[in-house]
Every structure is written in C-alpha cells, then in structure tokens.
C-alpha cells in the first residue's frame, strides 16, 4: 500500500478521498515522439518546464535516452529559457546595468533565444532592439535558479551536473554555454498533488540584493509602464487606480 508524503517535510498526504488532483511531471521524450509523428504544435499535460526545449532537441538531433551529457545540456538550455526574461536581466542582482540607458531597459526587455548545436552546446541571445542584457552574470544566475543541488538537478530524463558548465561571453548579448554533465535518470517522478482545505489567494514578488528597495521601485515603475503600453495598444484607457 502506498503511503505518499510531502517531498520536503515528509508529512503524510491526506486520504485519497480528499485529493483534488495529482499530476506527475513528465519528461521530453513524449514531446519528441509527437514531433516525430508530424505535430506542428504539441499540447501536453504537466511536464517539467525544460522538457519543451529538450523534446525539440531530441527530435532535431536524434539524441537517445542514454545520451546523458547531451540530455543534460538540452535540459540546461530549457532551464535557461523557461523563465523568459529572467535570463535577460529581469531579476538580475546587478540590476542597475539593465537601466543604464533608462527604464526602457526593463520596460522593453527582450525574451531569451537559444541557438542549439547537436553536441548540446548553445548560444543565448535576445532579439535586436529590445531591452535587457545577456551576460555571463544573467545566464549564470538563471542556471542556478530553483535547481537545489547544482551537481544533482533531477528531471525525468536525466540527472544533471551543472558544476562542469562553461559560460563564455562571445559578444554583446551573446553567451556561449557548454559542458553540462548527465547521469542516468531516477526511477521515480515528482508529483504535484492538491487537496481541498479552504481557499487562499495572493501574489508575493521577492526582490533581493544590493539596494533592493530602489530595485523594487524601478521594477514597479517598469511593470506599470509595460501594462500601460499594452492598454494603449488595445485602445483601452489607463488604470483608474493603482496601489503598490
């Protein structure tokens, strides 16, 4: 009989009758299979964020389930892309570099792009004429974001060691990434479970680092400016009230 528990605290989960949902985080190979069958767009259930990039790599380059190092590199590429403009400075410690030429550096921040090669190495960039920054610092911070142990980042298809990664600045807003090491995947999946126990809603945005209060104000101004640009583009009026 299964006795599932919360992965961090070890606390037992409620009785099955109280569970509202349970979703296993799947990997990249089902996405690659869908592409192999001719899909132009793949609609999937819960999967790890990096799987959408790794699945495309597996399909394009023909990587196998035991190409551990390549799978780790593809996972890293997906991890670098998965949070969008965090990689281009959206939550960078040295945030003042992003607004060196004005707040438009954040308001018009560009999303990251990865040009991948068959050996697993890739170059991170962003569209021209967009704000933000692609540097060793921005890419390195995203590499370490939410991975736990950098020598054992576990996803369904591979266990990744990012301590061997090499990151080199190739030019303005172009960073070359290579050298991730992979090991065989575990025999378990992470599962997200929800259960009914009342309701609570809220949004918390954490900003940290040097001059965090000033950083927070700049980001608030940028969020409102970006939202107002969207409203104007849709021929809608301004906010009647804002409270931050």
Residue ranges with predicted function:
Residues 150-152, 167-243:
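C-terminal catalytic subdomain
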Residues 2, 56-67:
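A glycine- and small-aliphatic-rich helix-loop capping segment at beta-alpha/alpha-beta transitions
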Residues 1-44:
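An acidic, phosphate/nucleotide-engaging active-site surface
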Residues 55-60, 116-126, 195-205:
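Short acidic (Asp/Glu) and glycine-rich catalytic loops that position anionic groups and cofactors
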